[in-house]
């Protein structure tokens, strides 16, 4: 069975798709909750991954809140961008996965609610959420 690393896997998304993934992969979760297999605060540290993963599902991040202070904007930057850099650094140490799936937000497209979005949609978000997710996307493209 293939190995899957799921960041943020004990959150909302993990609770909903985790049971399906468990049937298809040997899932290891990575995050800040006591229920995560690998305890790591990606915003602060490069996690020590025990081995190579075939697939990485990167779902941890900060969204759905409008930061009101510079400190809150910095938190978005640290979690969404720096956290992704730390994850990529850890993955390089154990071998690049054959697939990296990054769960992002429609904010990178400047959208606040439903419309059909494709890969051709322009990236023109102008919020701290969109900025940090766009930087994270760019980082992952270099992995």
What are these regions (language model features)?
Residues 4-20:
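N-terminal Rossmann NAD(P)H-binding glycine-rich loop of SDR-like oxidoreductase domains
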Residues 30-45:
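Adenosine-cofactor binding site in Rossmann-like domains, unifying the SAM/SAH pocket
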Residues 77-84, 101:
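Short alpha-helix in the Rossmann-fold core of NAD(P)-dependent oxidoreductases
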Residues 133-143:
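Single conserved hydrophobic/aromatic residue that forms the stacking wall/gate
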Residues 7, 30, 59, 100-106:
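SDR active-site strand-loop-helix element
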Residues 45-79:
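NAD(P)H-binding glycine-rich loop region in Rossmannoid oxidoreductase-like domains
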Residues 86-127:
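Conserved Rossmann-fold NAD(P)-dependent oxidoreductase catalytic core, especially the SDR/UDP-sugar
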Residues 77, 126-134:
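Short-chain dehydrogenase/reductase
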């Amino acid at each position: 069975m293939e190995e899957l690393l799921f960041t943020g896997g004990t959150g909302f998304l993990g609770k909903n798709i985790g049971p399906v993934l468990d049937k298809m992969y040997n899932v290891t979760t990575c995050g800040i909750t006591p229920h995560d297999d690998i305890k790591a605060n990606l915003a602060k540290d490069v996690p020590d991954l025990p081995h190579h993963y075939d697939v990485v599902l990167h779902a941890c991040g900060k969204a759905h809140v409008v930061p009101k202070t510079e400190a809150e904007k910095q938190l978005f930057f640290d979690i969404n961008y720096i956290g992704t850099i730390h994850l990529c650094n850890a993955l390089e140490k154990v071998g690049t996965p054959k697939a990296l799936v990054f769960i992002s937000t429609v904010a990178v497209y400047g959208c606040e609610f439903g419309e059909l979005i494709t890969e051709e949609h322009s990236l023109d978000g102008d919020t701290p959420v969109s900025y940090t997710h766009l930087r994270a996307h760019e980082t992952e493209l270099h992995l």
